[in-house]
Amino acid sequence: MSESLRIIFAGTPDFAARHLDALLSSGHNVVGVFTQPDRPAGRGKKLMPSPVKVLAEEKGLPVFQPVSLRPQENQQLVADLQADVMVVVAYGLILPKAVLEMPRLGCINVHGSLLPRWRGAAPIQRSLWAGDAETGVTIMQMDVGLDTGDMLYKLSCPITAEDTSGTLYDKLAELGPQGLITTLKQLADGTAKPEVQDETLVTYAEKLSKEEARIDWSLSAAQLERCIRAFNPWPMSWLEIEGQPVKVWKASVIDTATNAAPGTILEANKQGIQVATGDGILNLLSLQPAGKKAMSAQDLLNSRREWFVPGNRLA
C-alpha cells in the first residue's frame, strides 16, 4: 500500500500546501517537510513562513528550511529521514543529483502542464497566453534536467475563454493531488509506467516579468485579451497614461477591422474603452489606476474621461 511509503515532501507556496494536505488527509506517511526559509512580506517586511510550513507545523511534522541543498550537511538531513520517495511541488530549490538518488524510489515532481509542453517556471500563464485548448498536470520522475524526467501520470483539463491564470491555478491545484496520490500507489505497487518525453514537442515557459506585462498594442486583440487573462492575478497587464501605470483586469475582443494606428482610442462609453490593435479592436472593461481599486470602464470614465479621448493614442 502506498500509505506505507515513507515520504519526504518539499514545497513552498499555497499550490504545494494543497498537495501536502491531500497526502495527509489520505493517510500517507509524511516523515519530513522541506520548504524555503521564512521571507519578509507585507508593508512591515515581517518574516513570514511559507504556506507549506504553516500546514506542516499545524500537523506536527518535522520542518527543514535550508537555503540550499548543495552543502553536505543539508543533504544529510534528507538522508537521515530514510525516505522511500520525495515528493516535490513548487519547492523553489534545485535538488542536486545526490539528493535525487537518496530515496529508494527517487524524487517525483508535480508540474503544472502537459509535458513536454511548457517546461519551466510559468507553465500556467504560458499555456493560457498561447491559446492552448487544454492544460493539466504531469507527475514525473525527477532527473538533473529542467522538467526533463520520465512522465509517470497525467491529468488534463480544458482552458475556457473565461479562464485566468488564477482560475487555472485553482483547477490544477485540484488535479495535482489526484494525480499524485494515484502515482504514489502505482510506485508502491510496482505498476508505474514511465514514459520518456518527446523532445520534438518541447516548449519552454519562461519566467514572467512586469515589463513583459505592459500592453503592446501592435499585437492582435485576441493575443492581448489572452495576455490579460494570463497575467491575472500577477503581474497584471498594464498600460501607461500620463506617466501612471493602469492595470487591466478584463477586456474583450471586437472583431471589427480598423485602419487606425495601434493604440488609438476609438470609442469610450458605458460598453467599454475600445482601442485599435495590430489586428482588431480590444475593448477594455475593467481597469485599476495606481492607488485605486479595480473598477469598470464606465466608473473610470466618470472620473478620468480626459484620459480616453477618441483619437488619442495610448502608449
Curated annotation (Swiss-Prot):
SUPFAM superfamilies linked to this entry: FMT C-terminal domain-like (SSF50486), Formyltransferase (SSF53328)
Function, as annotated: Attaches a formyl group to the free amino group of methionyl-tRNA(fMet). The formyl group appears to play a dual role in the initiator identity of N-formylmethionyl-tRNA by promoting its recognition by IF2 and preventing the misappropriation of this tRNA by the elongation apparatus.
Protein name: Methionyl-tRNA formyltransferase
Family: Belongs to the Fmt family.
Keywords annotated in UniProt: Protein biosynthesis, Transferase
GO cellular component, one term: cytosol
EC top class, as a word: transferase
Organism the protein comes from: Shigella dysenteriae serotype 1 (strain Sd197)
